[in-house]
């Protein structure tokens, strides 16, 4: 595992200014991605901190950012944010539709100050539609897109994939793609725009290939009945003798043949395409994996093309030899964390700073962004009472 260091070049987005109106989930992660790529991300924290109550020193989604504290409900709070928006390339907010407008920092108000601004809106349901004003979380968003119903054992309830599928894959990544595409347009035309990134849209979009297979008759619309959803005995997970698991993805004929050879099940070579015998094959594979521990099977498949890997825990993953060799994880200030991704040959990225502490960077941002109003106390009475 590598140790984070400050690179001479901070990434391909060096020079891009981003304002993040503090929230939870996909918005902060999207802003972290931009910060990892070198953007100067200023997080506007609210007094009292975020609702999740995570120790700010360990909130890794705030790494590589700077923080100021602004009370948007104070008389001069909106003006301070508008001052930042006037100097920014991108603004990200994750409020319910209409909230930013009521706070005085909606897109029309921001664009009046900065017509080139890319205004990114991150929500679950989107800016319009019957559910737009309703509360929700990742699990509800992915439920209505059909993607949650694809995951899990056919004889049990849908499996909950943490909040990676909806919040981050269907949300954060699409917001980042959207604001960067809009930034490209703004720099070419001088005109900014609003990016409506909805988790329901992004998650549905992720299933495009599956919908094509469904239309072609190559996908059954029931969980655990298909090649890639656990229905196939040579694409799934198997328990080992020590209660751990191995992941198998031996789809292609030559990978399948090597898989069977290393398992000692060569007599099942003709079972690969015979769906009627998949149950028999699954039982045979499961029995073989139960005969040894996970680490023993890892050694058996080491160096092969059988497409088999151990299922690791979060704490185990940084120590995997391949990930360690690539420095997939890094350490900064004693916190082990995934390193920025992807990688760039000419503009390398790095974990430059740890999680931003609320309000700790106000003076530096006021100086660098030429916004001295940030240094003025919003509520002198509150300060006197402290």
Predicted segments, located by residue:
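Glycine-/small-residue-rich "gating" segment that lines the acyl/pantetheine channel
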Residues: 149-163, 218-233
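N-terminal helix-loop segment corresponding to the beta1-alpha1 unit
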Residues: 1-178, 182-191, 353-357, 361-386
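Glycine-rich beta-alpha junction loops
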Residues: 125-126, 199-204, 242-244, 250-255, ...
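Aromatic-enriched alpha-helical interface/lid elements that frame and gate functional surfaces
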Residues: 229, 234-304, 308, 375-377, ...
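Active-site-adjacent capping/gating segments
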Residues: 2, 7-9, 51-58, 314-360
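Beta-strand segments within the central parallel beta-sheet cores of soluble alpha/beta enzyme folds
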Residues: 192-200
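Short, surface-exposed loop/helix-turn segments at secondary-structure junctions
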Residues: 214-225, 320-330
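Oxidoreductase and adenylate-handling cofactor-binding alpha/beta cores
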Residues: 171-192, 205, 209-217, 260-266
